[in-house]
């Protein structure tokens, strides 16, 4: 395994959607091989059971197995907390479950220093809203088309030496309905965390990485590995950052050695 480039106290990943043809599995596997941590939080939708059940172009591939192997390998030195999401809700049959250094749970309270963070995927929001936006429907035809367009667009950008660019993120920033959905989601999730007596909340679900204060609660969203290629990282001083890959490996060539640049957004 390649030498680690960076070590963190905590890393949070979510919405990898193993089994979906849109999953950037090689990128996230590369990320885990290049970054280590004491605690790895997998914040839901790691495995896309919905896509696997639908079949068609979605199926379990060797690269998905390789990702699981990397998880098992790093679990010898890293505590792994797997919080189930809506696309891997098949885990409801077995949770809570602990084996070796891996725990599979519905939700989790993560304590760092004197702060408590409520960890959940975020699909609980779907149960209280009647406006089921395409943002929450990974299998939706419109969203699939957007991911296809994103792939074609970035393939051309990368041939020109330009960094990865998420079309979906730009749309979410400009479309009123999307902005409203994200805002309502954030407020609801923060409210839940506050009622749990937590100073922060860690979630995923909406494929929109973010770090910001909402009232007295620190809102942290790890984004996804279908379009955003993002994660959350925490250093030993308790500082959180949004990590975003700037290049998609599979858009250039099928290689583990491809250099991947990134940015860390300290908001």
Q: Can you name each region flagged by the protein language model?
A:
Residues 122-185:
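Active-site-proximal loop/helix segment associated with metal-binding centers of metalloenzymes
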